[in-house]
Structure formats: C-alpha cells, structure tokens
Amino acid sequence: MTRIADLRRDYRRQRLLESDAAEDPIEQFRLWLTDAVNAELPEPNAMTLATVGLDGMPAARLVLLKEVDDRGFVFFTNYRSRKGRELAAHPKAALVFWWAELERQVRIEGNVEQISAAESDAYFQSRPLGSRWGAWASQQSEVLASYAELEARLAAVEAHYGENVPRPEHWGGYRVLPTLIEFWQGRPNRLHDRLCYRRQGDHWQRVRLYP
C-alpha cells in the first residue's frame, strides 16, 4: 500500500493573474463555475458547507449550490436538521468548492439568512416528485431505527399527497452572504496563486496572498 505521505501531485495547468481576474468576485466565481460545468466535472456545484456546532465544534458536510446571484450563494435543506439548528444559533458559514481536474479551489466565508418562502416554494416545486416526497418522509439528522421505518414513512407520504406535494414549513433555502471569497489556482512547487476578495462596505478589496 502506498504511504499517504507519498501521495502528491504537482499542479501545472495555468495561472491566476490579477489582469485576468474579474473585479467582482461573484462574476469571477460564475466564470470558474462555468468552466467546471463545461469540463463536465462530476457535481460541479457540490460544495463543503461548514457551520459552528451548538457546542462550538465545527461541523462540515457536502451540499449542492442551487443558485448564485449578486447577493450570494443559495442551498436548500431541512431547517430542523443539524445544520439548520446550527445556522439558527450561529448564522455564519464557510463554503469550499474543489474542482480537482481544473486544479482550482474557491473558499467563501459569510453570514447566512433564510431566503423568502416564495423563493423556497418555487424551487421546491421544481424538484422531482420523489424528492418532494422525501422532504416530508425524512426527519433529517434524527436517529432512524431501520430503513424499513423510512420506507413506511415514504409510503404514507405518497398515499397522503399523491402528486400534489406542498413544501414543508421546515424545509427551505439559505443564502450565504459573502464577506470573503478566495480563489486558488494550483501551481508548481506548491507556489500556488491565491487571490482574496474582502467585502469593504459596498465594494470588494482584492489582494494576493502568499501560498
């Protein structure tokens, strides 16, 4: 078996220069996300979401980005889940996107708000029928005695709602309002390119960071 310490890769794909980067980090993010989609990477909108636990410990998991606009980055979940409870207590989060084939990472920090009920309703109704049933059947993050119990709950939801499934009040979207966005491009000898944007009032300040 290969020693973990011997696993390494040298990055040589391209540079990230100030002259090539957008002044607005949201615009720059859209450009990089488009590159990831066009490269047909698996789950290009997958991101690590880190929250502050109720006990002060950090918690992280993968979720899917579902919208990005000038305000921030939107994802959806059960408000009663662990992350939902953590965001209610500490409405701050960090996101990380990793596109290995492009040798790129984006790191985001910011405050978090729930999106409007109308926005959550619109997205919920766009989901596949099975996913809408699942939002009612799953008591996310609670202890499950057996998978059969979940199947029984799903069958009950199907029988009750059929194809007319409303959005549960405990399910909806969050928007991460970024205060920091950092773009990382892998380079040889671990001398990576890092451009960091920090929110300063109504504009962004961009600096280059040591790798």
Curated annotation (Swiss-Prot):
Summary of the function given for this chain in its UniProt record: Catalyzes the oxidation of either pyridoxine 5'-phosphate (PNP) or pyridoxamine 5'-phosphate (PMP) into pyridoxal 5'-phosphate (PLP).
Name of a matching Pfam family: PNP_phzG_C
Catalysed reaction, written as an equation: pyridoxamine 5'-phosphate + O2 + H2O = pyridoxal 5'-phosphate + H2O2 + NH4(+); pyridoxine 5'-phosphate + O2 = pyridoxal 5'-phosphate + H2O2
Cofactor: FMN
Cofactor: binding details: Binds 1 FMN per subunit.
Residues noted as binding FMN in the record, renumbered to the chain: 61-66, 76-77, 82-83, 105, 140-141, 184, 194
Lineage: Bacteria, Bacillati, Cyanobacteriota, Cyanophyceae, Acaryochloridales
GO-annotated molecular function: FMN binding; pyridoxamine phosphate oxidase activity
InterPro entries for this protein: Pyridox_Oxase, Pyridox_Oxase_CS, Pyridox_Oxase_N, Pyridoxamine_oxidase_dimer_C, Split_barrel_FMN-bd
EC number(s) on file: 1.4.3.5
Binding positions (substrate): 8-11, 66, 123, 127, 131, 190-192
Family as reported in the entry's similarity comment: Belongs to the pyridoxamine 5'-phosphate oxidase family.
Subunit structure: Homodimer.
Official protein name in the record: Pyridoxine/pyridoxamine 5'-phosphate oxidase
GO terms classed as biological process: pyridoxine biosynthetic process
Sorted UniProt keywords: Flavoprotein, FMN, Oxidoreductase, Pyridoxine biosynthesis
UniProt enzyme class: oxidoreductase
Record gene name: pdxH
Pathway: Cofactor metabolism; pyridoxal 5'-phosphate salvage; pyridoxal 5'-phosphate from pyridoxamine 5'-phosphate: step 1/1; Cofactor metabolism; pyridoxal 5'-phosphate salvage; pyridoxal 5'-phosphate from pyridoxine 5'-phosphate: step 1/1
